[in-house]
Amino acid sequence: MRKILLAGLIMFLSGVFASAFAQVKIVTPYKDLKVKVLRCAVIEGNCVVDMLFENVGAQDLKIWSSVDFNKAYDDAGNEYNTNYENRIYFYVGDMKNNIPSFNKEINFMSEVPVKVRAELSNISEIATAVSRLEIAFWVVTSLERPTVKISNIPISR
């Protein structure tokens, strides 16, 4: 009986966590770049959004991070950008781009998932979701700044 109750509880909790991210909306400017939100949690006063980026195309995708154009907004009305009070940090794999004007080439190899993290410093205590997260990239040959836009990310505390 305990096993059945435990199995039921696990299935229920799995459904709750899966449904929490079901409302997340993701728009990417690259048709072959798939983005998945893995978790969004507050750690030591900062909101950490862990994601998985995967290039499902046949060719590698080389783009530049454009950290100085990354932005986020929480549902309490706060903006996070490259200022020093409410700052957004950006990580790709083990690379840490935490200097606002630092741009670096990123190679998303075909069929190789890459962990990406956005960290919002000093997240509001009343925020329950990241209303919008904008991760900007930079096309070297033009002035374009294609942006991955993710909306309605629930924050777990």
List where the protein language model places each region.
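Short, acidic/polar linear motifs in exposed loop/turn regions
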Residues: 57-59, 124
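Short N-terminal segments immediately surrounding and downstream of signal-peptide cleavage
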Residues: 22-41
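Short beta-strand and strand-turn-strand segments in soluble, beta-rich domains
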Residues: 84-103
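Sec-dependent N-terminal signal peptides
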Residues: 4-16
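Solvent-exposed beta-hairpin/edge-strand motifs
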Residues: 66-87
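Surface-exposed edge beta-strand/loop patches
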Residues: 21-28, 64-73, 101-157
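Detector for glycine-centered tight turns/loop "hinges" at secondary-structure junctions
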Residues: 32, 58, 76-80, 144
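Short, well-ordered beta-strand segments enriched in hydrophobic/aromatic residues
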Residues: 47-55
